[in-house]
Regions:
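A generic alpha-helix propensity feature with a strong bias for hydrophobic helices
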Residues: 5-10, 22, 56, 175
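Conserved small/polar residues in nucleotide/adenosyl-binding loops
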Residues: 269-276
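Short, Lys/Arg-enriched N-terminal segments with co-localized hydrophobic residues
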Residues: 7-8, 14-32
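Metal/cofactor- and membrane transport-associated sequence elements
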Residues: 33-217, 223, 227-263
Length: 276
């Protein structure tokens, strides 16, 4: 095959120069990051994702059969809403430097979020992976919240509420605690989201439940499928290891202690539930 020498040199230069530059940039980032920690957090992120379908099944088995599909889809569809809200603005106002109350807009629409590390946020793992791990936390917080309105709220209004809640409630609280906000400056340490995830979703669920109300015609009923609830509980159990252990962001002594403590806590709870 013959090529015009001039054009061939130019095309060869253009073809080879760009990949080489890109490869060199990637290699520099690989050297800076810790590959063991990156793989570790990647696996933990996948485990935490399992918690959302797990809670969906858990709640779906506890409600009446006529409301099972709506209950399951409330948690699963929320994944889509949370993903859009988090990637567009939630991550930025949570972890970008701003003031004591809100983060800035540097990461708006995932701008400046990629394979590279961040010296202030994720010094040894890709910033994009850190963003995804935190997004899983936001997603599970919404799933926990959905349990308070099972069989009480319509599907579309709930999804609208989720989008607003992520931007107006969860993200600011995440910035207060994890993003250098006023709670962080008090010296507070929130390992694995005791405040950001559980208190925020719990209080929000309580307020939402009170506002909606149980209803006068609400009657007690037995769960329609405890097998589905059991399967969901197992998925949540499995995902909780990634949730707690991954919060160390590195495979070290803290991660192993979290792993052991989570195993013990789950076994003690299971034993207590079996006695009842």
């Amino acid at each position: 095959m013959s090529l015009n020498l001039t054009h061939g040199v130019i095309l060869s230069y253009r073809f080879l120069h760009f990949p080489q530059t890109l490869i060199m940039m990637l290699l520099k980032e690989v050297v800076r990051m810790n590959m063991d920690d990156t793989i570790f957090l990647f696996l933990c992120t996948l485990l935490v994702w399992l918690m959302t379908p797990g809670l969906s099944l858990f709640y779906g088995g506890l409600v009446q059969s006529k409301n099972a599909l709506n209950t399951v889809m409330q948690s699963m569809a929320a994944i889509v809403i949370v993903t859009f809200a988090w990637m567009i603005i939630g991550f930025s106002i949570s972890f970008d430097q701003g003031n004591d109350w809100l983060g800035g807009l540097k990461f708006l629409g995932l701008n400046h979020v990629g394979f590279a590390i961040s010296k202030t946020i994720s010094p040894h793992i890709p910033l994009a992976l850190f963003m995804l791990f935190q997004m899983m936390f936001c997603t599970i917080a919404v799933s926990i919240l959905s349990g308070s309105i099972a069989e009480k709220m319509r599907f579309i209004p709930y999804l609208i509420f989720v989008g607003l809640w992520v931007v107006l409630i969860y993200s600011p609280v995440a910035h207060w605690v994890w993003g250098g906000g006023w709670i962080s400056k008090l010296g507070a340490i929130d390992y694995a989201g005791g405040t950001v995830v559980h208190i925020t979703s719990g209080v929000s669920g309580l307020i939402l439940g009170i506002m909606i109300g149980v209803g006068k015609k609400q009657e007690k009923h037995t769960p329609h499928n405890l097998l589905i609830t059991l399967i969901g509980g197992i998925l949540v159990w499995l995902g909780w290891y990634g949730f707690n252990v991954g919060s160390a962001f590195t495979f070290d002594q803290i991660a192993m202690i979290s792993f052991v403590n989570t195993v013990i806590a789950c076994l003690l709870y299971t034993s207590d539930a079996a006695d009842e």
